[in-house]
Amino acid sequence: MAKEEVKQKKTKEKEPDITFFHPDILEVPKDGGLPYLKGYRCKKCGQLDFKTEMCTNCWSEEFEMVPLSRRGKVYSFSDIYIGQQGLATPYIFAYVDLPENLRVFAQLEGEVDTYRCDEEVELTLGPIRMNNDNLPIISYKFKKIA
């Protein structure tokens, strides 16, 4: 192969895809818009839930996707000093209550010992661990509102 062909082939190589954690409930708009969590509203009874095969209220299997609020309040949290393999410690896990009456489990961004219950937080994205190719897995997290 000529040097020029090798150079062109290298420049055409695709950048590695970003791995998102739970793409079934996390939407990252390709147009650069703000990321959001996805809820699913039952078309029969209106029950709102995260991704599910069947409505937890009426057992219907028909849903419509609904963008959820990007802000919520910390319901409870735990500072983790000895954690699971692959996660740098310390870190914070929390349950965050969204205005849509849904509670989501997520990592909080920032230093331990800095959050309190009922504190308002906002959705953000960040790495949570590395995949098998040693590339970051990006997930939804929540952070303090500036």
Swiss-Prot record:
The keyword Zinc applies. Coiled coil: none annotated. Its EC number is 2.3.1.310. Keywords: Acyltransferase, Aromatic hydrocarbons catabolism, Metal-binding, Transferase, Zinc. Zn(2+) binds at C42, C45, C55, C58. One of its GO terms (biological process) is catabolic process. It catalyses: (S)-2-benzoylsuccinyl-CoA + CoA = benzoyl-CoA + succinyl-CoA. Pathway: Xenobiotic degradation; toluene degradation. One of its GO terms (molecular function) is metal ion binding. InterPro entries: ChsH2_C, ChsH2_Znr, NA-bd_OB-fold, Thioester_dehydratase-like. Heterotetramer composed of two BbsA subunits and two BbsB subunits. Both BbsA and BbsB are essential for enzymatic activity. Component of the BbsAB thiolase complex, which catalyzes the thiolytic cleavage of (S)-2-benzoylsuccinyl-CoA to succinyl-CoA and benzoyl-CoA, the final step of anaerobic toluene metabolism. The BbsA subunit critically contributes to an induced-fit process for productive binding of a CoA substrate into the active site of BbsB. Contains an N-terminal rubredoxin-like zinc finger domain (residues 16-70) and an oligonucleotide/oligosaccharide binding (OB) C-terminal domain (residues 71-160). Binding of CoA to the BbsB subunit induces conformational changes of BbsA and BbsB, which may directly affect the turnover process of BbsAB. Belongs to the BbsA family. This is Benzoylsuccinyl-CoA thiolase subunit BbsA. The gene is bbsA.
